[in-house]
Amino acid sequence: MPPQPQIMVDLQFEQYMPDPDLETIAKLISQDPGLSGALLKLVNSPHFGLSNKIGSIQRAVNLLGSRSIINLINAQSIKGEMSDETIVTLNRFWDTAQDVAMTCLTLAKRTGIQPADEAYTLGLFHDCGVPLMLKRFPSYMEVLEEAYAKAGGETRVVDTENRAFNTNHSVVGYFTAKSWRLPEHLTAAIANHHNALAVFRDDTARNTQSQLKNLLAVLKMAEHICASYRVLGNQAVDHEWR
């Protein structure tokens, strides 16, 4: 996923400081889904041999250190070249991803049902398939607006996408998150974030299902609070909200 241009400017400025501050770098990286994904993919790779996968940006930055982070930033800046038109189109996505992530963090802290750092990661990455769909399908944003308009009852946002493209941003986001080596419970939440009603109706007592419900409860509430339906779907009401 292409990184947000202004974030790259701020990160490159920090890396040229005599003593780059890891906390500042982590905060900047946390604002961008593309950079965060590349970071977590790296730190969770077999090279580091971690027994438990990391879902926290700050922990990943602390583990890697400034030199590896700077190399990652430089690599992403090369991959992130986009047309001005694409940058403008994706501004809505970047802004909403950050808002939802911060709201997930707050909700997780207040309720205590989910680790706050993982809730933040889910909020940041849940729509990571959107810019990839847009890159592949120029008409994607128009279809996404139609999808939000038709959502409700038994019709999911992803159903409209499936009819138009034979795939959807939840599926693309799931495989992207897996390629970043995010923990399995986070990738499952990304895959199901427009299938929440079916998940909530499932009375299976498995611990993994309970964890998925908690993640989706935090995420869907954050999406509603941040009006994702208005920003991404161009709708006056949230047809998914019940």
Regions found by a protein language model. Give the residues of each.
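GAF sensory/regulatory domain recognition
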Residues: 146-152
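Conserved alpha-helical "signature site"
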Residues: 1-145, 156-239
